[in-house]
Amino acid sequence: MTSKDTLEHSIIFNQEIYPDTVQELMDRMTQYPIVNLYFSTDGGELDTMLVLIDFLNRRAEQGNVRVYLSSYCSSAGTLLLTDYNGPLYVQPTFRFFYFHVPDFMSYKFRKVVNEDRLRDLLLAYNETYYEKLKVVGLTRKQIDTIRKGHELYIFADELGKLKTTFITDEFEDRTLLYKPYDPPIIKK
């Protein structure tokens, strides 16, 4: 990904997903040829998250971004699992993905908008999202939990059950190694 003469830049993003925070992040990232993005979020707007993922996918195609999961990814942040095409690097501090039924934050729309049509569009979007979750490796039971309006957490020690390949990096004898992520083993 990098040559010895290319300097990498690291950016920490641990904010909610809104147009101003995402635009600021993208503007910062475009200032550097190679970015290590340490990402954590409480969630936010789905459409804004999809804009960010489109941006990250374009950079990933060029090989000039690494997305590190740090702390947790909630709500709209889970779209990294379903829509981001690059590898996801896992920090030792990553704890969980938090899923719930997606919504369009319809309280932001004026009441003159046909609420039945908005609900129909949302339900259609949600079905597409559930199909993507199935591809990622969530079980039917897990998806049904989300569909019924309940919360679902996938903790760091459960990431190995998903079909997504997660990567971790480790320094060994002063050499940076990239290897598949092994979830921690939690004794109960």
Write out the residue ranges for each language-model feature.
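N-terminal organellar transit peptides
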Residues: 1-76, 83-188
